């Protein structure tokens, strides 16, 4: 038994001492640090880069390596890597020492507005407004100080440029640039187009109003070549001279120098503008019939209004607000409506002037006097019939008057029956749905609007109002 216990203890001692002899210790402290560093997962990045570069150098130049290099120990390789790493670290430190002052210098120069080369061109008042002040902003979407414009300012600026340059391509260029940069979407581009079109119409109306105000003021247009005092030319005199002496006198068109694009488009004094109105037969016939000096002012106003409306329709067609067919239809209605309204307005004066052309001379016989009176009465009757016709003033006035009256009575009778049916069948319904007082006010407003547009005569409108007021 004692022998067995002694043998078991010897076996335990052998097992405990075996693992210690199986794993030898490192020979030196340097090998131990290298061993620990290789086992570590957090090696410095610089060492990894240097080691990779050293491997590349060895692979690229295998023939230049000496036979003794294969006998180098890991300690020599580590020293080589350390030398390369230290060299790279020193170079990076030198670059970092040099770079901060340079960066600071650039920042100081950027912040210093006096060193900006673009300021000379920006504040040069001799340059045109189309020479854009920012190289990265060729469409001029910045203010003078460089701050971005608001949405309303951009819309107004685009509309102004389209009006000044008379070119739709300006809008397309700006929108395509904004779309390419991703600043707006397709829907926003359509919205912007509507807003620009609205702003352009307001701008045209504003310029037209300003131009009409300047027509009332006499202005000195030119100066004689001999150095004389400039002549005062009023718009009325210019129109009269241009219409009566178009073949012989060309000084009027030469003296009327226009300053902006709107005046070039709406100037009634030019000969070619007056000839353009020949394409509107009703209006042109009305103009040629106005010859008296008292109606010269009326004639000038009519030409200005008609030219402004024609150019406005052209602009709407050009920029896609309305179709060309709608523009032609609108111009045809415009020609007929303005001519008819003006003729009705001047009817009283025209009748008086015509009646004065047929007085009863004292030296004529009684029969001749009676025939003259009959002719004058006929003319008054014909001109009076124009009040009852709003559709066609070139056809037989008597027949058209009867037809217009019959249509009016039938129309009024239909209104009367419609209202009676509403009163009869709406006893249980909501009274507010067919409130006659509200309907009466609405009909009165519509009738007045139709009178202003020339759709109804004043007598027809009054008849409609009486029917609704009697219910």
Swiss-Prot record:
It holds the Pfam family SGIII. Glycans are attached at residue 40. The modification Phosphoserine is found at residues 40, 365. The keyword Secreted applies. Residues 1-22 form the signal peptide. Residues 28-45, 345-355, 364-404 have a biased composition (Basic and acidic residues). GO terms for biological process: protein localization to secretory granule. It comes from the Eukaryota. The keyword Glycoprotein applies. Keywords: Cleavage on pair of basic residues, Cytoplasmic vesicle, Glycoprotein, Membrane, Phosphoprotein, Proteoglycan, Secreted, Signal. It is found in: Cytoplasmic vesicle, Secretory vesicle; Cytoplasmic vesicle, Secretory vesicle membrane; Secreted. One of its GO terms (cellular component) is transport vesicle membrane. Transmembrane segments: none annotated. It is a peripheral membrane protein. InterPro entries: SCG3. Expressed in various brain areas, with highest levels in the arcuate nucleus and the lateral hypothalamic area, as well as the paraventricular nucleus and the ventromedial hypothalamus (at protein level). Residues 24-45, 89-108, 345-404 are annotated as: Disordered. Member of the granin protein family that regulates the biogenesis of secretory granules. Acts as a sorting receptor for intragranular proteins including chromogranin A/CHGA. May also play a role in angiogenesis. Promotes endothelial proliferation, migration and tube formation through MEK/ERK signaling pathway. Interacts with CHGA. Interacts with secretogranin II/SCG2. Interacts (via C-terminus) with CPE. This is Secretogranin-3. The gene is Scg3.
